[in-house]
Amino acid sequence: MNKYLSILSLALVIMFIAAATSIAQHEGEKLSTEELASQIGRSESELKEIDNKIIVYNETIKSNPEDADAHFNLGILYEKKMKFKDAISEYQQAVNLKPDFIDAHINLALVYTERNMFGESINELKQVLEIDPQNVAAHKYIGRSYYKTGMLEDALVEFKKALEIESNDPELYCYLESVYFSMGRLDEAAAELKKAIEIDPQFKVAHLNLGFVYYEQGKLDEAMEEYEIAIGIDPKFADAYSNMGLVYCQKKMFDDAIAILKKAIEINPSLPDAHNNLGFAYWNKGLQDKDNNADENGNEWKKKAMREVTIYKGLIGAK
């Protein structure tokens, strides 16, 4: 789970499944081909290829309605097109035809999760555990649903069960860290992230999250070091630049904050928190200049701040 710092919000986003939440809130059939291609990062030609495959699988099912694999593959294609209702229908038909079809149960559970249907997702994953009690993905995604619904103790249990089965999965330690963080157990959160990094030193999300934990603990230099490592792994990691900007703000180094936040926005103009954080940096730069009797640009800083906050609100859909 990523943790992105901002003044007005703290975005907690789990990155490890196919579609982002902002995408999952829309159904693909409501978008034009061009809009859909932009949303899901595919070319229009790729979408047309998916459409052709959908036609083929529909023909297969028409001739053999009891082909569970065809329903499953059609569900995947609908999911790629963001036609989630259709995807759910196909996955449901797949598991009805083949009750021990684990991949279909898991895919169905993940679509439920993306639509915030957490109870349905958990029920589906529990069916997987009845088939295979050692299924790591089922424990992991049940824990994820528990976490998203605030059932932290239950989430902790599921993530630990997953780790008992697969102890070398760095993502699991990040999930576990998220629970500890939400419980306010920051030392334990940091310890889990260090385990993830020990397994995979190039795991940029773990470095990002560890920087966040250090920031919350007031360990600003340590936080900055983790963000620098994350950027060293991925120089285009906009979230790390954004978080680094608030560390500079905390140190009252607003010029540096503004520069690094502009870098984050240059990499990803649609990153809401980077705009929000830049607005915070502009606002405080104006206050700093006022305190230093250098307030000739005070109104300009405020205008810049409000412009960034307006962009931020637009990106998150706030009015």
Residue ranges and their predicted role:
Residues S9-I17:
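Bacterial N-terminal signal peptides
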Residues T21-D69, N73, M82:
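N-terminal leader/linker segments that initiate helical-solenoid repeat arrays
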Residues S45-E59, K81-Q93, E114-Q127, A137, ...:
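Structural signature of tandem alpha-helical TPR/SEL1-like repeats
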